[in-house]
């Protein structure tokens, strides 16, 4: 994986994603189509084509494919320049065929869109612009310079200049439109893939930390007896070596280090104990656990938990799922980062849903992008404002995307809004005047069912 400043994957390496085998297969399809069109046109329609030159043009593609197949490995990844050269060869070969077969009077001139579309989907913008400009240039050349199509009666096929110009204009517009549209779709797919990869990495990290805690707890339990034995033996040696100060000091040092190991394992075991009972907790405890890393960052974090109409007075006991904690933590981090002084975390529950609202007293979300919050790589703040509040933060919206994806995976619905009009004056704004995030779960997706089994039975070996 190649890291870069523009995201998870450096955009400059996109050409490395194109496989040579993919372009070879596409070229074989083009060769088959060209041969079929040439044979049908000459034999069935009776159009007189320069068959030798046409087969020579198609043969050039066949030779290039055979060389690429036998010389290079099938899993060869192409650089940006190599992919450009291959597509440029295909574009030139197709233009030569159009030159031989009537230019724009040949309806297959539409196929000149294919190399540009492939470039827009797989390569960089600069490469696509170059290839598109060359395609328009070659198309214009074949419009003026081409061999006429000779029909069976010996006459040449001609079309009105207005029709030929309209066909040329349609293909040029198609090159521009399909290039831009395909480019936009490719960027959206790549951004979403990168953000989903980052989400999966964050969730995997959280899961590994949880698993590591269980391993540490087990290690602390298993090492308890050996450490107790070491401490007992070292204490007895220290008493017996009272007349040999040097050896006695060594025995006491061993005992002290055994005590130190015991204390370390005990603290780690408490932090990472993977008891099934600890996989569930009251709603308030889960919210405090999610907010814990950001409570001491100079902003006041207030919790308010209450039942709504029809809700039980007791807090619901919910699952401590890693994606829920990590997602809420990202939302709380964003609120703390941009709050002036206070962040409010409200928990509300009824008989069929659980709602959590995170509100701050900052400036709120920019109105221009509030409908796009949660999309990957959306810049939410100006660079200078973001840097003053969050040093080293580039504001790409990836944190909110990760939070949104993780929480939606757990069955939640998220909504983003501003608590007050961002254009109000400071003295006119209410206390809760910043951004609002509301997360709502159906009860059955989050609440622990009473009397339900905690997990699979563990085989007890004797």
From Swiss-Prot:
<feature type="topological domain" description="Extracellular">
    <location>
        <begin position="150"/>
        <end position="164"/>
    </location>
</feature>
<dbReference type="InterPro" id="IPR003661">
    <property type="entry name" value="HisK_dim/P_dom"/>
</dbReference>
<dbReference type="InterPro" id="IPR005467">
    <property type="entry name" value="His_kinase_dom"/>
</dbReference>
<dbReference type="GO" id="GO:0005886">
    <property type="term" value="C:plasma membrane"/>
</dbReference>
<dbReference type="Pfam" id="PF00512">
    <property type="entry name" value="HisKA"/>
</dbReference>
<keyword id="KW-1133">Transmembrane helix</keyword>
<feature type="transmembrane region" description="Helical">
    <location>
        <begin position="26"/>
        <end position="45"/>
    </location>
</feature>
<feature type="topological domain" description="Cytoplasmic">
    <location>
        <begin position="1"/>
        <end position="25"/>
    </location>
</feature>
<feature type="topological domain" description="Cytoplasmic">
    <location>
        <begin position="183"/>
        <end position="462"/>
    </location>
</feature>
<dbReference type="InterPro" id="IPR050980">
    <property type="entry name" value="2C_sensor_his_kinase"/>
</dbReference>
<keyword id="KW-0902">Two-component regulatory system</keyword>
<feature type="topological domain" description="Cytoplasmic">
    <location>
        <begin position="124"/>
        <end position="129"/>
    </location>
</feature>
<keyword id="KW-0547">Nucleotide-binding</keyword>
<protein>
    <recommendedName>
        <fullName>Sensor histidine kinase RegB</fullName>
        <ecNumber>2.7.13.3</ecNumber>
    </recommendedName>
</protein>
<keyword id="KW-0997">Cell inner membrane</keyword>
<dbReference type="GO" id="GO:0000155">
    <property type="term" value="F:phosphorelay sensor kinase activity"/>
</dbReference>
<feature type="domain" description="Histidine kinase">
    <location>
        <begin position="218"/>
        <end position="445"/>
    </location>
</feature>
<feature type="transmembrane region" description="Helical">
    <location>
        <begin position="79"/>
        <end position="96"/>
    </location>
</feature>
<feature type="transmembrane region" description="Helical">
    <location>
        <begin position="104"/>
        <end position="123"/>
    </location>
</feature>
<feature type="transmembrane region" description="Helical">
    <location>
        <begin position="130"/>
        <end position="149"/>
    </location>
</feature>
<feature type="modified residue" description="Phosphohistidine; by autocatalysis">
    <location>
        <position position="221"/>
    </location>
</feature>
<keyword id="KW-0812">Transmembrane</keyword>
<dbReference type="Pfam" id="PF02518">
    <property type="entry name" value="HATPase_c"/>
</dbReference>
<keyword id="KW-0808">Transferase</keyword>
<dbReference type="GO" id="GO:0005524">
    <property type="term" value="F:ATP binding"/>
</dbReference>
<feature type="topological domain" description="Cytoplasmic">
    <location>
        <begin position="71"/>
        <end position="78"/>
    </location>
</feature>
<dbReference type="InterPro" id="IPR036890">
    <property type="entry name" value="HATPase_C_sf"/>
</dbReference>
<keyword id="KW-1003">Cell membrane</keyword>
<feature type="transmembrane region" description="Helical">
    <location>
        <begin position="165"/>
        <end position="182"/>
    </location>
</feature>
<dbReference type="InterPro" id="IPR047770">
    <property type="entry name" value="RegB"/>
</dbReference>
<feature type="transmembrane region" description="Helical">
    <location>
        <begin position="52"/>
        <end position="70"/>
    </location>
</feature>
<dbReference type="Pfam" id="PF25323">
    <property type="entry name" value="6TM_PilS"/>
</dbReference>
<feature type="topological domain" description="Extracellular">
    <location>
        <begin position="97"/>
        <end position="103"/>
    </location>
</feature>
<keyword id="KW-0597">Phosphoprotein</keyword>
<keyword id="KW-0472">Membrane</keyword>
<keyword id="KW-0067">ATP-binding</keyword>
<dbReference type="InterPro" id="IPR036097">
    <property type="entry name" value="HisK_dim/P_sf"/>
</dbReference>
<keyword id="KW-0418">Kinase</keyword>
<feature type="topological domain" description="Extracellular">
    <location>
        <begin position="46"/>
        <end position="51"/>
    </location>
</feature>
<dbReference type="InterPro" id="IPR004358">
    <property type="entry name" value="Sig_transdc_His_kin-like_C"/>
</dbReference>
<comment type="function">
    <text>Member of the two-component regulatory system RegB/RegA. Involved in the positive regulation of photosynthesis gene expression in response to anaerobiosis. Also involved in positive regulation of the cbbI and cbbII Calvin cycle CO2 fixation operons, as well as in regulation of expression of genes involved in alternative CO2 fixation pathways. Phosphorylates RegA/PrrA.</text>
</comment>
